[in-house]
């Protein structure tokens, strides 16, 4: 069962399964038009830049204080999605999330500062699916993912993420600190 975080500090084993970036948007700004054709690039490692995003990604330096400097998606959710639709030939990258990770309930990280492989993040919000999920994956994917389409986060320290096993360490539960104040 994936780690779920509820107001306490802890660490857990996780695994970074895949890393993706794209230099341009294929869906944002394309409503009512065909999607763009910018390739999704799978990486073995990626540079995280404080307050800016992933070096080379379309959202790098997108906007000041942007909540989606990096996006995470659970490998377990992707597996359920594939099983539900009977689709095995599409990679997790079609969902346009940056980091595919296993071993953690990502939505439990909303409001938390956490660290993976020495890089610190703040979980900001659910990365809600858009209509393009039905185009990129299969009709009905948006509805299937409406409650669990990933995590948006801010990057709080420079560093590099790489594929493989890692520790996810909760640095602080920001929402618990605010509600207890």
Q: How would you label these PLM feature ranges?
A:
Residues 101-156:
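Glycine-rich active-site loops that engage anionic ligands at enzyme catalytic sites
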């Amino acid at each position: 069962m994936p780690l779920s975080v509820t107001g306490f500090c802890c660490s857990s084993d996780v695994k970074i399964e895949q890393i993706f970036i794209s230099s341009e948007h294929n869906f944002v700004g394309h409503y009512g038009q065909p999607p763009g054709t910018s390739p999704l690039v799978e990486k073995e490692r990626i540079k995280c830049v404080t307050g800016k995003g992933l070096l080379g990604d379309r959202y790098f330096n997108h906007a000041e204080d942007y909540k989606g400097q990096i996006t995470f998606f659970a490998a377990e959710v992707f597996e359920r999605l594939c099983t539900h639709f009977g689709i095995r030939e599409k990679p997790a990258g079609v969902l346009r999330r940056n980091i595919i990770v296993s071993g953690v309930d990502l939505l439990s990280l909303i409001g938390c500062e956490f660290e993976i492989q020495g890089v610190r993040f703040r979980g900001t919000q659910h990365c809600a699916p858009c209509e393009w999920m039905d185009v990129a994956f299969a009709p009905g994917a948006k509805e299937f993912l409406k409650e669990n389409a990933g995590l948006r986060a801010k990057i709080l320290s420079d560093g590099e993420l790489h594929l493989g096993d890692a520790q996810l360490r909760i640095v602080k539960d920001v929402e618990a600190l605010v509600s207890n104040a």
